[in-house]
């Protein structure tokens, strides 16, 4: 893989900019992203990884888009896990959540540029098929304005997206053929990996404190049943457009109060409700449908 991409690497290093990676499940996007970072650092560039894969996160916990601006000794999985900035998308699937995912991604690309990074690699989700896959990637392309698009092509699945990138952006679009005989992780394996990521995040140590019903976005209606929020993942917003981390809401039936469970203990001004429920051991408790939760259209 590396040798086939050598000409691409050379062009990027000669004229660094924003590189957006497109590809399906287990196509090798993250491996190439880290290689780009490594080569960029070796050539004296200031590099950044914007990890927009909210389900199989490399930077930060699932449900977030993460920004990492690593140094030469910070390219291990463990080092990349620690985000320099987070933006809360609130979901582990792009379907039905295109706006928060696109907004979070573009916010962190802008943050990377503001930090002075001249090589920014954007790793995206494997949601590449169908109408909504095209809409998601189109709007990401429009808002991130990449200089390069690297498409990990496997069996023609990216042909519509490659066409969109070539017609609607000024980016250099490169297709990289991925072997079709390589086994991909199963749905169960991907779920286990995600649950392990959640568990590791909360294993770092958590605090519990009471939460006022007035701090949420969306705003809770009068007489809202707080028990309905039990287990929901929330983004802990700092009031300056960034996310300090995530937490899980815990409802105390005996006292009729909500508590926040999170390793984050300060710098939080508001809580954004996510669209997934989990236990603090990382186990999934299912999705959240806002229309049913708020009984509205």
Give short role names for the model-derived ranges.
Residues 29:
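Conserved lysine of the Walker
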Residues 32, 36:
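Hydrophobic positions on the alpha1 helix immediately C-terminal to the Walker A/P-loop
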Residues 111-169:
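Phosphate/Mg2+-binding loops and adjacent switch elements
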């Amino acid at each position: 893989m590396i040798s086939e991409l050598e000409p691409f690497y050379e062009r990027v290093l000669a004229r660094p900019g924003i590189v957006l990676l497109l590809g399906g499940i287990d196509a090798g996007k993250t491996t190439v992203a880290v290689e780009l970072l490594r080569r960029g650092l070796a050539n004296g560039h200031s590099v950044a990884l914007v990890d927009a894969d909210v389900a199989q996160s490399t930077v930060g916990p699932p449900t977030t888009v993460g920004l990492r601006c690593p140094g030469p000794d910070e390219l291990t999985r463990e080092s990349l896990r620690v985000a320099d900035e987070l933006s809360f998308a609130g979901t582990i699937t792009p379907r039905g959540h295109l706006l928060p995912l696109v907004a979070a991604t573009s916010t962190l690309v802008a943050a990377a540029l503001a930090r002075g990074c001249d090589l920014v690699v954007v790793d995206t989700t494997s949601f590449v098929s169908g109408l909504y896959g095209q809409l998601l990637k189109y709007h990401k392309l429009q808002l991130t304005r990449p200089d390069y698009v690297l498409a990990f092509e496997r069996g023609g699945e990216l042909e519509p997206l490659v066409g969109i990138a070539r017609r609607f952006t000024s980016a250099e679009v490169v297709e990289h053929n991925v072997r079709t005989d390589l086994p991909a992780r199963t749905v169960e394996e991907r779920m286990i990996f995600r649950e392990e990521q959640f568990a590791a995040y909360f294993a770092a140590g958590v605090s519990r404190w009471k939460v006022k019903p007035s701090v949420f976005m969306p705003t809770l209606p009068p007489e809202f049943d707080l028990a309905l929020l039990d287990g929901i993942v929330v983004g802990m917003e700092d009031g300056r457009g960034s996310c300090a981390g995530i937490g899980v809401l815990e409802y105390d039936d005996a006292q009729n109060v909500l508590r926040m469970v999170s390793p984050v203990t300060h710098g939080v001004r508001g809580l954004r409700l996510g669209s997934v429920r989990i236990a603090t051991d990382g186990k999934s408790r299912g999705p959240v449908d806002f229309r049913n939760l708020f009984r509205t259209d």
